[in-house]
């Protein structure tokens, strides 16, 4: 399943943001340049972790899925756990078998998950770079502008999020962001090789 806040907090408490060995070189530089010490919207006050949510600041829900992390953070966490991020193809196959639990913003959601969370409310980072599918030919007009020019230095996220319109949501829906971005509803799933 998705990495929980509790699981990620172990990484934070173990000095995951102070140890370069689990970070990609570019990620380590980004993290140091921007003084990143925890997921976006987390903060520590009066010996307790809090998180800014869509309904304001609240104590960090340790059982909830982790949200608002960059590719760099996701990759460092996976390395720390002795795992890796799934490929785009692995995650698509996995998501087809999962039950969709939608709770879209338009339906009054105040948080990107609920107690029976499966997928559909958080994007999940993959290790796959955003590149065209085999046989891809750019369309003329606006779609060419949207797809073709962005296939550089971006990583694929899968699964949809609470801000994904129902008409767009499907198991094969791809999103992509630069590896330092973490403002979107992004979470982590881990993968291991069978051998």
Question: Which functions belong to the PLM regions below?
Answer:
Residues 63, 99-119, 175:
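Short, well-ordered junction/capping motifs at the entry into regular secondary structure
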Residues 84, 94, 109, 116-122, ...:
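Structural signature of nuclease core domains in nucleic-acid processing machines
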Residues 1-100:
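Active-site microenvironments of metalloenzymes and redox enzymes
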Residues 96-97, 101, 191-195:
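Short amphipathic alpha-helical segments
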Residues 58, 106-108, 125:
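Catalytic DNA-binding helix-loop module of base-excision-repair DNA glycosylases/AP lyases
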Residues 5-6, 12-36, 118-195:
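Surface-exposed recognition segments
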Residues 80, 114, 189-191:
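Residues within well-ordered beta-strands of beta-sheet-rich folds
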């Amino acid at each position: 399943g998705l990495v929980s806040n509790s699981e990620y907090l172990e990484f934070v408490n173990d000095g995951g943001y102070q140890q370069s060995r689990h970070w990609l070189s570019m990620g380590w530089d980004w993290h140091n340049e921007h003084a990143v010490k925890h997921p976006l919207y987390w903060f520590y006050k009066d010996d307790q972790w809090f998180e800014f949510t869509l309904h304001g600041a609240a104590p960090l829900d340790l059982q909830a899925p982790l949200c608002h992390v960059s590719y760099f953070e996701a990759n460092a966490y996976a390395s720390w756990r002795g795992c890796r991020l799934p490929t785009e193809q692995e995650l698509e196959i996995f998501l087809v078998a999962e039950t969709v639990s939608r709770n879209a913003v338009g339906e009054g959601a105040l948080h990107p998950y609920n107690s029976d969370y499966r997928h559909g409310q958080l994007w999940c980072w993959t290790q796959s770079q955003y590149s065209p599918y085999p046989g891809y030919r750019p369309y003329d007009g606006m779609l060419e502008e949207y797809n073709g020019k962005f296939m550089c230095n971006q990583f694929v996220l899968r699964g949809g999020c609470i801000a994904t319109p129902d008409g767009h949501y499907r198991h094969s829906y791809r999103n992509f962001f630069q590896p330092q971005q973490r403002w979107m509803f992004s979470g982590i799933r881990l993968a291991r090789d069978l051998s």
